[in-house]
């Protein structure tokens, strides 16, 4: 078979897999073909060994796959959340009828919501530097979902690991007390991220990752989809992150970590998030990709298209 035809067939197979991942949100594994095409980058990230963990996949292609990117970045249930996908144009024009509402869909998987609540509680315990017991977690889950506790804990643990780089560690095999292990140390003195406080440094890197994976811009819907999977909802005060809308559209925008702009030529107006100048100054696409790769137990080469883009940016910057 001619070489060009093989390439076309391979590209077609990738597109088919991407469609399947978007529909089923199964964890994508890097294929042999992708490994051959991806430049070797084993030296680009330290301590990132390949893993067969179910949380080890993030979509490979940059085409708009918001659900896949959000679900993979969040590391929780593949249930597509419709909540929080809200345009706040109504704040500027109360008469606007185009903006979708942020109502909570009754059809959402209740286990997903419980795992989100558990993630919120665990982040709070991490913030105050306290261990957590099984009994405390069962109180969050409630009697109604007690029998589903193992599944809920598994989803919450994956979310903590993939998004925030935190692992729950049982103090002893027969005990019921857990402590936290930070898999990704963002407080290294040499790191430009050392000035980021908690929880900013634990949320901003994944947010920058979602924007990068979505083609360097993410719509409100895509950002809310990601946040909803973490148990962060519009209009609800979060015990760790505070009021989420204020955090992402005001605080992080004013600090120039994010930009919040109208999508060009959108009618009715729609808004999107981009990296701000301070994000470009204090980190890079490669660092964000290395972060995502490390917490997923893989390497940046697992995302060949994004890796190539990050490499080009490094070359332009003379890194």
Swiss-Prot record:
Residues 111-310 form the MAGE domain. InterPro entries: MAGE, MAGE_N, MAGE_WH1, MAGE_WH2, MHD_dom. Transmembrane segments: none annotated. GO terms for cellular component: nucleus. Expressed in testis and placenta, and in a significant fraction of tumors of various histologic types. Residues 39-57, 67-79, 94-105 have a biased composition (Low complexity). Keywords: Phosphoprotein, Tumor antigen, Ubl conjugation pathway. GO terms for biological process: negative regulation of transcription by RNA polymerase II. The modification Phosphoserine is found at residues 77, 105. It comes from the Eukaryota. Residues 1-17 have a biased composition (Basic residues). Residues 1-112 are annotated as: Disordered. May enhance ubiquitin ligase activity of RING-type zinc finger-containing E3 ubiquitin-protein ligases. Proposed to act through recruitment and/or stabilization of the Ubl-conjugating enzyme (E2) at the E3:substrate complex. Interacts with TRIM28. This is Melanoma-associated antigen B2. It comes from Homo sapiens.
């Amino acid at each position: 078979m001619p070489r060009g035809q093989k390439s076309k067939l391979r590209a077609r197979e990738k597109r088919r897999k991407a469609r399947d991942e978007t529909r089923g949100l199964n964890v994508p594994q890097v294929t042999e073909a992708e490994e051959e095409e991806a430049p070797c980058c084993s030296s680009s990230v330290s301590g990132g060994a390949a893993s067969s963990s179910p949380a080890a996949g993030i979509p490979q292609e940059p085409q708009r796959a918001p659900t896949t990117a959000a679900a993979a970045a969040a590391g929780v249930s593949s249930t597509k959340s419709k909540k929080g996908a809200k345009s706040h144009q109504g704040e500027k024009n109360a008469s606007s009828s185009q903006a979708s509402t942020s109502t909570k869909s009754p059809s959402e998987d209740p286990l997903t919501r419980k795992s989100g609540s558990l993630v919120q509680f665990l982040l709070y315990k991490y913030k105050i530097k306290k261990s957590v017991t099984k009994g405390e977690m069962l109180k969050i889950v409630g009697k109604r979902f007690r029998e589903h506790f193992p599944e809920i804990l598994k989803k919450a643990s994956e979310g903590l690991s993939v998004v925030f780089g935190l692992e729950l560690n049982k103090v002893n095999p027969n005990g019921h007390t857990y402590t936290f292990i930070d898999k990704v140390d963002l407080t290294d003195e040499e790191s430009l991220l050392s000035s980021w406080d908690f929880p900013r440094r634990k949320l901003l890197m994944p947010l920058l990752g979602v924007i990068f994976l979505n083609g360097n811009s993410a719509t409100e819907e895509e950002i809310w989809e990601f946040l909803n999977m973490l148990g962060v909802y519009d209009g609800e005060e979060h015990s760790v992150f505070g009021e989420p809308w204020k955090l992402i559209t005001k605080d992080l925008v004013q600090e120039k970590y994010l930009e919040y702009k109208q999508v060009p030529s959108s009618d009715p107006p729609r808004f999107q998030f981009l990296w701000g100048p301070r994000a470009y100054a204090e980190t890079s696409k490669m660092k964000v990709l290395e972060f995502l790769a490390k917490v997923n137990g893989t390497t940046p080469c697992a995302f060949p298209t994004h890796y190539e883009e990050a490499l080009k940016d490094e070359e332009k910057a003379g890194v």
